[in-house]
Regions:
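Hydrophobic alpha-helical transmembrane bundles of multi-pass membrane proteins
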Residues: 5-213
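Short, well-ordered junction/capping motifs at the entry into regular secondary structure
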Residues: 1-2
Length: 213
């Protein structure tokens, strides 16, 4: 039964991982043609950064196994610090801890991808990569601990089964803050009026929408 649960979760997380293609095509389709290559590069880069930061410290911060009901989890580095024996089956969860790591890492990349769409054509690529590292290694794990890691929201009875708050609301909050701080895209209001900025490829954007759907 546990092996079946791990196999099923493996299918689900691969589907979530496929959302990265949807985000990439959606963004690349709606930005101006001159920025499409940067958008594709940015989405590949953010996925790599999210995976690295969550492996480096994010997973252990989100699931510290301590400070239940707390707000700030203890900070630890490296998924490997759990010990090799803990990579295997977790009978409390019904699947392997390593499988849970993969499941969560595609979620953190999804949250960062939401931010990517909000700052498209607004933010320097390297500055965005730094922001992606901060979200993946600090913001997402801490707020994820509040619920899924047995923090204070979990203790209060809050339930977020599919990540509407932990993933999507967290990503949306970061996206809104970034958009407000940075301001509009260059050229949007350059003449004192609202200028139309045409997307590079609407069919590609539509395909990305359906992949996400």
């Amino acid at each position: 039964t546990h092996h079946a649960s791990s196999a099923a979760s493996d299918v689900y997380k691969r589907q979530v991982m496929w959302m990265a293609a949807g985000f990439t095509m959606l963004e690349a389709g709606f930005v101006r043609r001159r920025n499409t290559a940067e958008i594709v590069t940015k989405n590949i880069g953010l996925y790599s950064i999210a995976c690295f930061m969550y492996l480096l410290c994010g997973f252990m911060v989100m699931y510290p196994g301590a400070n239940e009901g707390g707000i700030i989890p203890p900070y630890d580095f490296g998924f490997g610090s759990k010990g090799q024996e803990d990579f295997g089956m977790n009978t409390d969860l019904g699947y392997a801890d390593a499988a849970d790591f993969f499941f969560q890492v595609v979620f953190v990349a999804t949250a960062v991808s939401i931010v990517s769409g909000a700052v498209a054509e607004r933010m320097n690529q390297w500055a965005f990569f730094a922001l992606a590292a901060f979200i993946s290694g600090v913001i997402y794990p801490i707020q994820g601990f509040w619920n899924w890691g047995s923090g204070f929201l979990n203790a209060a009875g809050y339930s977020d089964f599919a990540g509407s708050g932990t993933v999507h609301l967290a990503g949306a909050a970061c996206a809104l803050a970034a958009a407000i701080f940075i301001g509009p895209r260059v050229g949007k209001y350059s003449t004192g009026k609202v200028n139309k900025l045409y997307g590079a490829n609407i069919p590609i954007a539509a395909l990305g929408t359906f992949i996400l759907w």
